[in-house]
Amino acid sequence: MVKISLARSLLIAGLAYVAFEARAFAQEGLVLTELENHVSAAAKGWETTILDAAKSLFWILATIEIGIAAVWLALQAASLDSWFAELVRRIMFVGFFAFVLTQGPTFARAVIDSLFQIGAGGGSASPAEIFDAGIRVASQMSQQAQFGVFEDNALAIAAVLAMGVVVICFSLVAAIFVSVMVEMYVGLLAGMIMLGLGGSSFTKDFAVRYLVYAFGVGMKLMALVMIAKIGSQVLLGLANAPTASSDQFVTTLAIAGISVVVFIIAMYVPSIIQGVVQGASVSGGMETIRHGGQAASFAAGAGFLAGGAARTGFTAGQSARAAGSSLAGAALRGFGAGIGSASSAAGSAAKEKAIGSPGAYAGSILGLANAKLDESRGGHSGHKPPPERKD
C-alpha cells in the first residue's frame, strides 16, 4: 500500500507539472533566441578589432610579396616589359585579395543567409521555433493521456512517455541549432584573420578556405533547418491524423521513435554535409547507423516497458476488483501498481548497471528493466541459483 500510494502521489505530481508548466516550457524557447542575440552582439563588438589586425597582416605580406618579386626581377636582369607585366600581375593579385579582405565577411554572411533561407523554405526558422514545434507535438499527444476506468491506460502511459521523448529530442535539436549558430558567429569572426593571409601568394589558400568554410557552415545550417522542419511537420501530421483506436498505441510509439531518429539525423548529417563541402571526412556512415540502432533499441525498450507496466496495472486492478474494491479504487490501484512496478524495475536496472552487477554489463538499462518487470510479474525476483555440488 505504501508503494502504491507513493506511485500515485508521483503520478499526480507529474501530471500537474505537465499541465501547469506547458506555458513555462514554451517561454523557455525564447531563452534560446536571447542567447543567439547576445552571441551575435558580442561577436560584432570584436569584428572591428580582428578586421584591423587582418588588414595590417595583409599589407605587411603584400609589401613582402612585391619586394620579393622586385628582387627576383633584378637578379634576372629583366627587361622593362617584364617589369611592367609583373607589376600589373602583382597589382591585380593584391587588389583582388584586398577586395576579398574588405568584402569577404559581408559576402560570407550573405551566402549563409541565402542558404539558411533555402533551408527554411522562404520562411523563418530559429532554435525557439524548433523547440516550440516539439512542444506543439507533445501538446497534441497530451489529448491521448486520459486515465480512468473506461479509458485506455496503456495508451495514456505510452503517450506520456512519448511526450517526454519528443520534448527532450526537440530540445536537443534546438541545442544543436544554437551550437551551429554560435559556430557561425565565432568561426566567421575568428576566421577573418585568415583573410589577411591573402596578401602573399604563399598563404593565399588560407583566405580561400575562409570562403569555403562560410559556404560549408551555410550548407550545415540549411541541412539542419530542413531536417528540423521536415521532422516537425511529419510528427505534427502523425499527432493530428485521425486513427483507429487499435492504431493509436502504435502511432504514439512511432512518434517517439521518429523524434529520436530526427535527433540522430540532426546530429550527424549536417556535419557530414559540411565535411563534404570542405573536402574532409567528418563521420562514417556506420557510426550513424550504429547510433540509429541504439536509438531504435531505446525506443523499443521504452515501448515494451510501458506495455509491461500496463499489463501489471491491469492485473492489479482485476485483483483489487475481485477483492471487493470499487471501480475507481481498482483503477487507481492498478494504475499505481503499473507505474510503481515500471519505476522500481527501471531504478533497479540502473543501480545494477551502475555498480556493474554480473550479467548487467552486456545489456541496456531498458532491457534489464523489462527483464525485471517480467520476473516480478512471473512471481520470482531473480534467476534461481544453480544446485550445490555435493562432492
UniProtKB/Swiss-Prot annotation:
* Alphabetized UniProt keyword annotations: Cell membrane, Conjugation, Membrane, Plasmid, Transmembrane, Transmembrane helix
The record's annotation in Pfam families points to: TrbL (PF04610)
Where is this protein localized, as stated in its record? Cell membrane
Membrane topology designation:
Multi-pass membrane protein
| Record carries keyword Nucleotide-binding | no
Query: Record keywords: Transmembrane helix included?
Result: yes
Q: Which InterPro entries match?
A: Conjugal_tfr_TrbL (IPR014150), Conjugal_tfr_TrbL/VirB6 (IPR007688)
A GO term from the CC aspect: plasma membrane
Q: Please give the residue ranges the record annotates as the region Disordered.
A: 372-391
Transmembrane parts of this sequence = 12-32, 57-77, 92-112, 115-135, 157-177, 178-198, 211-231, 253-273, 295-315, 322-342
Q: Name one GO biological process term.
A: protein secretion by the type IV secretion system
Spell out the coiled coil positions from the record.
none
Family statement: Belongs to the TrbL/VirB6 family.
Which NCBIfam families does its entry note? PRK13841.1 (NF010415), TrbL_P (TIGR02783)
This protein is called Probable conjugal transfer protein TrbL
Which organism is the protein's source? Sinorhizobium fredii (strain NBRC 101917 / NGR234)
